């Protein structure tokens, strides 16, 4: 069986920082996490404590600025990036969407239609 090359796409608006090491270990059971991107508004002081732990875990920080309150710019940025990876990086054979937001179902279906392995990690109620 061929090792999967997995892209971890992290929705920081709906994830807890302390679980990230466990999430990465879980992903490693299924393949090699070669892309680790964390999406969020990094100018927001709420995420200031995330920079060092994410850097230590080799995540690339993707800025998703919020221009209007209560809009899902982080979700949209994550979906656009996933689609870009899907169509431009054929060596990516799997995706791990880390979020406790159920809005990603259409993305998951599109990835599966394109024969990609997909993991979803989030809270049980998601």
Residues covered by each model-derived region:
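Domain-level signal for Mg2+-assisted phosphodiester chemistry and nucleotide/NA-binding surfaces
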Residues: 1-87, 107-113, 117-119, 124-125
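Glycine-rich phosphate-binding loop signature in dinucleotide/nucleotide-binding domains
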Residues: 88-93
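Non-catalytic, usually N-terminal nucleic-acid engagement modules in DNA/RNA processing proteins
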Residues: 97
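Active-site-proximal cofactor/substrate-binding loop regions of enzyme domains
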Residues: 101
């Amino acid at each position: 069986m061929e090792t999967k090359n997995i892209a971890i796409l992290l929705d920081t608006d709906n994830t807890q920082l302390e679980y990230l090491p466990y999430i990465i270990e879980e992903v490693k059971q299924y393949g090699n996490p070669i892309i680790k991107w964390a999406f969020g508004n990094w100018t927001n002081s709420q995420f200031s404590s995330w920079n060092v732990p994410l850097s230590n875990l080799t995540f690339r920080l993707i800025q998703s600025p919020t221009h209007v309150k209560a809009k899902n710019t982080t979700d949209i940025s994550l979906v656009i990036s996933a689609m870009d990876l899907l169509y431009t990086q054929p060596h990516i054979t799997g995706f791990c969407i880390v979020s406790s937001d159920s809005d990603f179902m259409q993305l998951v279906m599109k990835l599966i239609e394109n024969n990609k392995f997909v993991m979803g990690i989030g809270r049980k109620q998601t």
